[in-house]
Curated annotation (Swiss-Prot):
Co-factor note (free text): Binds 3 Mg(2+) ions per subunit.
Lineage: Eukaryota, Viridiplantae, Streptophyta, Embryophyta, Tracheophyta
Physiological role: Responsible for the cyclization of trans,trans-farnesyl diphosphate (FPP) to (+)-delta cadinene.
Major enzyme class: lyase
Catalytic reaction equation(s): (2E,6E)-farnesyl diphosphate = (1S,8aR)-delta-cadinene + diphosphate
Family classification: Belongs to the terpene synthase family.
EC number: 4.2.3.13
MF (Gene Ontology): (+)-delta-cadinene synthase activity; magnesium ion binding
Xref: InterPro entries: Isoprenoid_synthase_dom_sf, Terpene_cyclase_plant_C1, Terpene_synth_N, Terpene_synth_N_sf, Terpene_synthase-like, Terpene_synthase_metal-bd, Terpenoid_cyclase/PrenylTrfase
Protein name as catalogued: (+)-delta-cadinene synthase isozyme XC14
């Protein structure tokens, strides 16, 4: 989350004789203004709620009803998931897939069915073997030329390949094979298959944000001739109901943010509370996580302010007491801070105090201590980076990586995301998370390395900041593009680790693991074409507009 800088004008309210030459990050103001300050003056009417409930029960019956073959069952479950309503039917879908896993009819398994079955089962943790794809290869070990004409089968194989783990060479080959042939075929396809293929080549199902993907698929699914009218109507109503809830949450958060008045008090910092909410709604969008969403959005907003304080304004001498104050976590420390640091320090403590009050009624105060400790570790790693910048120190790549991974904040966000969850989260969950398990490591690597490539490639970094890409280039004598390729390989490897951690038996319930999966997905969506959070790229603008502004036409 580093930035380009310019010199802060001496007329700035924060400048003084001592520090009038401080750098100031040249961030654009929020593009949303006060748009989300007020919630739309409407509620879901009783008739719509009744219809929603009626359709929900009809869809539930369809999921568990016998169908002519497993292909139909798999396709229906896939539609339920891709339309964003599977959270209503978790047990029913799990039971149906368990049955399919144990009762495979090989006669049905063309490329489409084999790939769809593989993807859905892997998504739900069933360790189905990638050997099921061997029958689509010839004696030379290449994919048969006959499958290239099966575009729908190729599309499903492409999507399935993103569930691969380490050692699954056939799926590594499948990514290249399907990408090549789908790219060649897309121009000659008819709608809506052409749209499915072109969208998939930009964003796979596995790495896309479920609600963003659901919004897109709603517009495609209704044009598929064989679509299920009951499911489509239910998904549209459900989308709008959840959107209204999200707008109410964002309105509440926007008022909190406006009251803090950081735009005036801390002009060096990013004003990205809307983008922060979009980020966190990617971590969990479902209605039952409303409390968690609001708490975690406030945390990411404050983490962004703290990051900018370390990275874009404060002197190293000021950061020492600031870090100590965060470590001590005591409002009495505020008197030891420079005047401009006091508002952010107080606001940080207030966010966690509110968090404690909200979870106290369920006896979950212990969770907030883990969240505080995660924030403290984040601040400590920021201080290390600040010291390196002050000393113009060039660490080795491994030394840089050891400190840079914590500074991306993903371990902190993962741990804090558990605070607002239900009884599925226990003290053991936090002990597990605090020990840096593989899935949190993997999502952190995805975050850090995608951020590093984006910052360097799109020149979103201060010249005096330590750059992971430049550390690597200098140490190994490679070009920038060669360094990008190495970092991208680390990202691909981390995705395989994420996938592996979902295969049963798992260390933690899927509901817990999903938080790290979704954090990784946010990076894939927001950072593939630059820092989409700081510089609010096309993905962020489009996602916020489609999820929070425009309802689905019924």
């Amino acid at each position: 989350m580093a930035s380009q800088v310019s010199q802060m004008p001496s007329s700035s309210p924060l400048s003084s004789n001592k520090d009038e030459m401080r750098p100031k990050a040249d961030f654009q103001p929020s593009i949303w203004g006060d748009l989300f300050l007020n919630c739309p003056d409407k509620n879901i009417d009783a008739e719509t709620e009744k219809r929603h409930q009626q359709l929900k029960e009809e869809v539930r019956k369809m999921i568990v009803a016998p169908m002519a073959n497993s292909t139909q069952k798999l396709a229906f479950i896939d539609s339920v998931q891709r339309l964003g309503v599977s959270y209503h039917f978790t047990k029913e879908i799990e039971d149906e897939l368990e049955n399919i896993y144990h009762n495979n009819n090989d006669a049905e398994n063309d490329l489409y069915t084999t790939s769809l079955r593989f993807r859905l089962l892997r998504e739900h943790g069933f360790n189905v073997s990638c050997d099921v794809f061997n029958k689509f290869k010839d004696e030379q070990g290449n994919f048969k030329s006959s499958v290239t004409s099966d575009v729908r089968g190729l599309l499903e194989l492409y999507q399935a390949s993103y569930l691969r783990v380490h050692g699954e060479d056939i799926l590594d080959e499948a990514i290249s094979f399907t990408t090549n042939h789908l790219s060649l075929a897309v121009a000659s396809l008819d709608y809506p298959l052409s749209e499915e293929v072109s969208h998939a080549l930009k964003q796979s199902i596995r790495r896309g944000l479920p609600r963003v993907e659901a919004r897109h698929y709603l517009s495609v699914y209704q044009d598929i001739e064989s679509h299920n009218k009951v499911l489509l109507e239910f998904a549209k109503i459900d989308f709008n109901m959840v959107q209204l809830l999200h707008r109410k949450e964002l309105s509440e958060i926007s008022r909190w943010w406006k009251d803090l008045d950081f735009q005036r008090k801390l002009p060096y910092a990013r004003d990205r509370v809307v983008e922060g909410y979009f980020w966190i709604s990617g971590v969990y969008f479902e209605p039952q996580y409303s409390l968690g969403r609001k708490m975690l959005t406030k945390v990411i907003a404050m983490a962004s302010i703290v990051d900018d304080t370390y990275d874009s304004y404060a002197t190293y001498e000021e950061l020492i007491p600031y870090t100590k104050a965060i470590e001590r976590w005591d409002i009495k420390c505020i008197d030891e801070l420079p005047e401009y640091m006091k508002p952010s320090y107080k606001a940080l403590l207030d966010v966690y105090e509110e968090m404690e009050q909200l979870v106290a009624k369920h006896g979950r105060q212990y969770r907030v201590e883990y969240a505080k400790n995660a924030m403290i570790r984040l601040a400590q790693s920021y201080l290390v980076e600040a010291r390196w910048t002050l000393q113009n120190y060039k660490p080795s790549f491994e030394e840089f990586k050891a400190n840079a991974l914590p500074t991306c904040g993903y371990a902190m966000l993962a741990i804090t995301s558990f605070v607002g969850m239900g009884d599925i989260v226990t003290p053991e969950t936090f002990k597990w998370a605090a020990n840096d398990p593989k899935i949190i490591q993997a999502s952190t690597i995805i975050c850090r390395f995608m951020d590093d490539v984006a910052e360097h490639k799109f020149k979103h970094r201060r010249e005096d900041d330590c750059s992971a890409i430049e550390c690597y280039m200098e140490e190994y004598g490679v070009t920038a593009q060669e360094a990008y390729d190495v970092f991208n390989k680390h990202v691909e490897s981390a995705w395989k680790d994420v996938n592996k951690e979902f295969l049963k038996p798992t260390e933690m319930p899927t509901e817990v693991l999903n938080r790290s999966l979704n954090l990784a997905r946010v990076m894939d969506v927001l950072y593939r074409e630059g820092d989409g959070y700081t510089y609010v790229g096309k993905a962020a603008k489009g996602g916020i507009t489609s999820l929070l502004i425009e309802p689905v036409a019924l």
